[in-house]
Amino acid sequence: MNQTVDGVAPNKSGPVIEIDHVTKRFADYVAVADADFSIASGEFFSMLGPSGCGKTTTLRMIAGFETPTSGAIRLEGTDVSRVPPHKRNVNTVFQHYALFPHMSVWDNVAYGPRSMKKDKSEVKRRVDELLEVVRLTDFAKRKPGQLSGGQQQRVALARALVNYPSALLLDEPLGALDLKLRHAMQFELKRIQREVGITFIYVTHDQEEALTMSDRIAVMNAGNVEQIGTPTDIYDRPATVFVANFIGQANLWSGRQTGRLNRDYVEIDVLGSKLKARPGDTAIEAGGHATLMVRPERLRVSMEPPVGDVAAVRATVRDMTFQGPVVRLSLVAPDDSPIVAHVGTEQQLPLLRPGDEVYVCWSPDASLVLPAADIPTTEDLEEMLDES
């Protein structure tokens, strides 16, 4: 399926895309700072972050719409940093699909191979194959205006895939769809990517999209790549406070790491108690400032003191909010730190009122000690997402 780039045969043994210490400046503004990672063949790779983090600039450099200030971008082993977009074997799908309104679905998809002077039988084979993959065979004769938003999205995908690119670049393509359709299209995109086996590079600020579809995620912030990993790695073992806060919801409490208990656990002085916790990947010296992270759904709340190998603190109930499958408990620790717990509605939660004293506990394996950092407030996060 892979073709040549600027007349040079691709190296199929290495990664499809290599971002080699790439920096992009616009005057004095650093949009991307020393990005260094690779993307494997057949991988669904997402770049995730708030507005201004550098994800779209990185995608535009891969596509050829921007040129790196320094570093190199390689496509199947060939340096394409200064190769124009039309000579790179990649295609891009944007939020606005730019389908030809006067052409049928079939002719829209056929536009690419026809422009490459493929013979009629090859054009038919490719178009029919892609329409079957995106499940639009029965809509081949319709015009784009006769399709739903999700169907138009799939036409745009088929048109971008029909020339067999080495990688498909997707710049927030689901942003124009309503919430329910956007959720459905997440699973459709992943299904299509698995069927065609082509590398997808996906840009989004939506953490749910990235977690649902991706094989790996690069979380970006202020031009820097904060962490690259699988969705499970990113969620369960975030490398920084920013990643922990941006991916899902997290309790983040400032404290001091007092020492190492054994190979697997450390002790951290936080929430007015000394608690057993998992160390993160960044070493922190004894006595050093640190941040303890625990996800709200990993907390348990009870009126009775917990037993067994658990971390536990006393807390005071501030508020309870019913949110369908969970009850959101807002609590405060003895040192006035806020605690948020998500308790499944199927659990036998005691009847609680604001002001009640409870025990909040969790397994040490559910916690993670991260390097100390400023902890964003709820207002900071809402502003960040609004700007995205």
From Swiss-Prot:
User: What catalytic activity does the UniProt entry give for this protein?
Assistant: ATP + H2O + polyamine-[polyamine-binding protein]Side 1 = ADP + phosphate + polyamineSide 2 + [polyamine-binding protein]Side 1
- What is the topology of this protein in the membrane according to its UniProt annotation? Peripheral membrane protein
Q: Where does ATP bind?
A: G49, P50, S51, G52, C53, G54, K55, T56
**Do the record's keywords include Cell division?**
no
Keywords attached to this entry:
ATP-binding, Cell membrane, Membrane, Nucleotide-binding, Translocase, Transport
Q: Which cellular component, as a GO term, is one annotated location?
A: ATP-binding cassette (ABC) transporter complex
Q: Which Gene3D superfamilies match?
A: 2.40.50.100, P-loop containing nucleotide triphosphate hydrolases
Q: What is its EC number?
A: 7.6.2.11
Q: Which Pfam family is one of this chain's hits?
A: TOBE_2
Which stretches are transmembrane? Answer: none
Check the UniProt entry and state the signal peptide residues, or none: none
The record's GO molecular-function terms, alphabetically, read: ABC-type putrescine transporter activity; ATP binding; ATP hydrolysis activity
As for subcellular location, the record says: Cell membrane
Q: Does the entry annotate any disulfide bonds, and if so which pairs?
A: none
The residues covered by the ABC transporter domain are 17-247
Q: Which domain of life is it from?
A: Bacteria
In which family does this protein belong, per the annotation?
A: Belongs to the ABC transporter superfamily. Spermidine/putrescine importer (TC 3.A.1.11.1) family.
Q: How does it assemble?
A: The complex is composed of two ATP-binding proteins (PotA), two transmembrane proteins (PotB and PotC) and a solute-binding protein (PotD).
The function of this protein is:
Part of the ABC transporter complex PotABCD involved in spermidine/putrescine import. Responsible for energy coupling to the transport system.
Q: What is this protein called?
A: Spermidine/putrescine import ATP-binding protein PotA
Q: What does UniProt list as this organism's lineage?
A: Bacteria, Bacillati, Actinomycetota, Actinomycetes, Mycobacteriales
Q: Which gene encodes it?
A: potA
